[in-house]
A protein has these predicted regions:
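N-terminal [4Fe-4S]-dependent radical SAM core
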Residues: 1-22, 35-41, 154-155
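Short pre-active-site segment immediately N-terminal to redox-active cysteine/selenocysteine motifs
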Residues: 22-29
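Cofactor-binding loop segments of dinucleotide-utilizing enzymes, especially the Rossmann-like FAD-
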Residues: 24, 70, 98
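Short, basic/glycine-rich phosphate-binding loops at helix/coil junctions
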Residues: 30-38, 60-63
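Flexible loop residues that form catalytic
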Residues: 38, 70, 118-119
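Canonical radical SAM enzyme core domain
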Residues: 40-53, 73-113
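Conserved glycine-rich "GG(E/T)P / GGGxP" loop and the immediately following alpha-helix
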Residues: 62-81, 85, 131, 137
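Classical nucleotidyltransferase
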Residues: 108-155
Length: 155
């Protein structure tokens, strides 16, 4: 999978210690994009599932993996393979995508949390944002507020 960068964080997913993976490439051209420099699908570096497993073993405190971008949904086969690994490692999986939930639904088998919608300058933490938060409850998905997510966490 083409990856632009990887970092750790505590903000992107409430109540989790997160390994943030910035997927390389995005077809959307959101005005004010935070990461316009990683839109090109040919940039970044190729990372295998095996290499990711080794990397995660070096971060034993991580409880969640969060896909940011770029947009990982434009690498669907690789995204699903990585997410299967993350679930086997008992990690939560969060996905930020500029696409809408219904368009990426088939990619969500091993995902716990989705933040969807193009960036329009208002963060998902603001109730007036166009972006939506979807949380998995067993086999059902529910659209919740950021405040609810802060209370409940992604699991």
């Amino acid at each position: 999978m083409r990856i632009a960068s990887i970092s750790t964080g505590f903000i992107e997913v409430p109540k989790e210690i997160t390994l943030n993976i910035y997927a390389q490439g995005c077809k959307l051209r959101c005005e004010g994009c935070h990461n316009a420099q990683i839109r090109d699908f040919d940039g970044g570096e190729e990372l295998s599932v095996e290499a990711m497993a080794k990397l995660l073993n070096a971060y034993p405190m991580v409880t969640c993996v969060c896909w940011l971008g770029g947009d990982a949904t434009y690498q669907p086969e690789e995204l699903c393979k990585f997410n299967t690994l993350f679930k086997k490692m008992n990690l939560s999986v969060a996905l930020y995508t500029g696409r809408v939930f219904s368009d990426v639904y088939d990619l969500l088998k091993d995902v716990d949390l989705v933040i969807d919608g193009e960036w329009k300058g208002i963060p998902v933490t603001d109730a007036t944002s166009n972006q939506k938060v979807y949380k998995r409850y067993a086999e059902l998905w529910k659209n919740i507020s950021w405040e609810e997510l802060k209370e409940e966490g992604p699991r």
